Amino acid sequence: MTNNKLILAIETSCDETSVSVIKNGTELLSNTVLSQIDSHKRFGGVVPEVASRHHVEGITATIDESLVSAKVKMEDIDAIAVTQGPGLIGALLIGINAAKALAFAYDKPIIPVHHIAGHIYANHLEQPLTFPLMSLIVSGGHTELVYMKNHLDFEVIGETRDDAVGEAYDKVARTINLPYPGGPHIDRLAAKGKDVYDFPRVWLEKDSYDFSFSGLKSAVINKLHNLRQKNIEIVAEDVATSFQNSVVEVLTYKAIHACKTYNVNRLIVAGGVASNKGLRNALSEACKKEGIHLTIPSPVLCTDNAAMIGAAGYYLYQAGLRGDLALNGQNNIDIETFSV
């Protein structure tokens, strides 16, 4: 008799079809990711209908591949975790319907998982979470600060009021003719450029932990437009450096300030933008100076993947959370509703 629990996790919230098998919330047995980046590049961003069609085409094979990689069968699985939201509703439904079909066919419980909770728990796959902690979520669709006193205890203390940081990266990248996704390209150029443009830092109200990147995005676009009107040469590396420094300074300051205010000495970072080298370096230096323990997952666990959904799903399963065959996707759902 064993107490080991195997979670089959499914993630289809945006443009990655991913399936993973996780043992006891920490041991990664498989993590299969089918990326759609090449399909969306020509459009300069994710096209929801195209994403949904790719999920339909790839979900069955991805499930099969993940089970084979983990060397388990569906009969061995204890529960099926699936991203309920937030995300593209059509994309979410592909994963949810696959999870419901498996749950019905094999009589397995369904565990609905919040996408951002998954990003947070990606850290747990490499280093056990210790509490209390502050989590900085930085991705294409989200920029948030989440305070946690314990497992599955989510308190959002700050969030973006307009553009998410990853969205701002992609839009600025487009203005200097960089391909999608723009974040990695800006990060690469920023390492070679100079901070010559005085782009704004948006702090909002005193002691606010919210973020705003639409003003910065507009400032960059307007600056480039004016330079082109005057036939002044634009150095893409300098634009990237100046833009990224503005973003990183705000993210770092607010994350450190939140840790101090809430008296926590552990900061974790989650989401696709967490793989940004400029941000990782700035946070590392600031946390070292302030005596804060910093955890950032490996780049492969920063982007969307099912392993993170399985890690969070394991704790939701242990806490008794269950979905049913009426489970539906939600394109906008509060992470605090998943607190237990």
Swiss-Prot record:
Keyword terms of this UniProt record: Acyltransferase, Cytoplasm, Iron, Metal-binding, Transferase, tRNA processing
Role description: Required for the formation of a threonylcarbamoyl group on adenosine at position 37 (t(6)A37) in tRNAs that read codons beginning with adenine. Is involved in the transfer of the threonylcarbamoyl moiety of threonylcarbamoyl-AMP (TC-AMP) to the N6 group of A37, together with TsaE and TsaB. TsaD likely plays a direct catalytic role in this reaction.
Subcellular location: Cytoplasm
Cofactor info, note text: Binds 1 Fe(2+) ion per subunit.
Top EC class of this enzyme: transferase
UniProt GO BP: tRNA threonylcarbamoyladenosine modification
Gene assigned in the entry: tsaD
Cofactors demanded by this protein: Fe(2+)
Pfam families: TsaD
GO molecular function: iron ion binding; N(6)-L-threonylcarbamoyladenine synthase activity
GO cellular component: cytoplasm
Catalytic activity, EC: 2.3.1.234
Similarity comment text for this entry: Belongs to the KAE1 / TsaD family.
InterPro entries in the cross-refs: ATPase_NBD, Gcp-like_dom, KAE1/TsaD, Peptidase_M22_CS, TsaD
Lineage, broadest ranks: Bacteria, Bacillati, Bacillota, Bacilli, Bacillales
Protein name (record): tRNA N6-adenosine threonylcarbamoyltransferase
Annotated positions binding Fe cation: H115, H119, D304
Organism: Staphylococcus epidermidis (strain ATCC 35984 / DSM 28319 / BCRC 17069 / CCUG 31568 / BM 3577 / RP62A)
